[in-house]
Amino acid sequence: TIAGMIGMAVLYYFNFAPAWSVIVVNAILASFLHELEHDLIHSLYFRETSVEKMMMWGVWMFRVNTPSPFYRKKIHLLHHKESGQLSDIEEQMIGNGMKWGLTRIVVMLDQGLAFLINSRRVGKTAPKLSKAEMAKAAFPFTYIYQATSLLFINGNLYLLLMPLFNAGFVAPAWLVQMITVVNFLAVVIGLPNFIRQGCLQIVSSSMHYFGDVNPDGTVGVLEQCQVMTARSWYMLPFQLFCFNFGSTHAIHHFIVNQPFYLRQLGAGYSHAAMKKYGVRFDDHGSFARANRYHPASPALLPAGEGSLS
């Protein structure tokens, strides 16, 4: 997968592939890396070896807008243990429990802003959250990504708008060269990962239930996730860039140590069993309920507010 992303970058550099194709293909390839990282977090390959660590570093380097997988392992395993509870750090940080609105959309799309918006509130309900540890886990790749993103947006806006205010404007050569490099990085890794991460978090924060899930694991596992099939047609564009996450992730809550490719291959059989035992499919009403499982439950995390109501 990494070789594929590098290959697309080479094709783009030598003008053999248009920018849009590189962005789309690398976003899809990066979604494979997320699934591989997820399996590594559950120690499915080369457990506790240098090869496992090397693979985790590799998936992080090519998915630059995420925290360290070594830190993600900690909060993801907590997610499995306490999914849907107020102590679930992972899902709260991407918007679970918030009413739909601008704040939630921002939280789902941008990890940096999600940290600034949600970390204080989540810290009150999830005692295992350390803001300092989470900030450290973003170093160095997420900080490089954020800085490069700001250069990409502001640099291109500057070069675009300055001639409108000054007809004789000539951009300095160093600035043009720097923005050329930044634009290349944006096409081959920045924008693909923005699309991948945004799609994943939109799907994940929509399919998980939160706040009123039964804390008894034997019962609660049936309430932790819904399954989003093709009937949730509005999710299909997002599913493309997160490896069909909405359809298969709920299976993972039941069969934790199953590699992602087997989960995809056996999805039809798993769905039949899950439906038999009452797992919900295409529960469109959960959007209006701010991820609550039960329609009568009170709203927990109103958009834009920093405390529980």
Where are these regions (language model features)?
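Divalent metal-coordination and catalytic microenvironments
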Residues: 76, 208, 252
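Short active-site segment of divalent metal-dependent hydrolases/proteases
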Residues: 41-42, 211, 251, 255-256
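Non-catalytic, topology-defining segments of multipass membrane proteins
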Residues: 1-32, 36-37, 41, 53, ...
